[in-house]
Amino acid sequence: MTMIEPEVIEAARRVGAARELPPEVLLAVSLVETNAVAHARVGGRREPLIRFEGHYFDRRLDGEGRERARAAGLASPSAGAVANPASQAARWALLGRAAAIDTEAAYASVSWGLGQVMGAHWQRLGFASARALAAHARSGADGQLDLCARFLLAEDLADRLVAKDFAGFARRYNGSNYRANRYDEKIEAAWRRADALLDASPVAPGAALGRGARGQAVFDLQEALAEAGHGLSVDGVFGHGTEAALRAFQERRGLAPSGIADAATLAALDGGRAGSCG
């Protein structure tokens, strides 16, 4: 079994906290789509994993551009007719050839990063262009997982995973043929592995904490909230109760009630605990 880089696990926690998603959701999708591999070495650079879809490219071209792309084997009206090379370096070279014909159409025809989100979704995910979406993916694991989070939220898919409706998620994410791909089984197994990875990987000291975080840092946060007079379970799992208590604390202290234990909130909690000592 491939080892998962701590960078990806921490990115899932950060993005999950920022987007109010359990990090298991982001990790599970990444495990199925890219084995949670955030980067490949391409020409000495760290680049996100990509997959080029020639039928998307074909639809986004017309006239001479489409003729050139088809003649070069870069575009086809049929899905799967343009094969993806095995290596990421070769895929990036293919993308470069497509971009020489039409950069925006080429970037819209690629699935990007850990969650393999299509560049074609750039507008509904809040980007100015497909190139801007690609730049977000190329910024690092956080950017890639943020793309995944935006897509899951836009499609109302995250709740299906949280509810462990793996078949319902697979149908929406992978298509009606999901059983042939065993996508429901894959995402269920990935969910269990993501859960175990988060349990086994401690939260980095000083990291922001949000829904889905767990471990000693969450336990300490819950104890501090309890000492501050907020009723909640002290169990090391950041769920609805912890979020509600944290929002109440933030409102009381004049902080933005985000429900995320950021640096300012943690400092306020630490200050309150220090002030309570005799």
Give the ranges of each region predicted by the language model.
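Polar low-complexity intrinsically disordered regions enriched in Ser/Thr and small residues
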Residues: 57, 66-68, 76, 83, ...
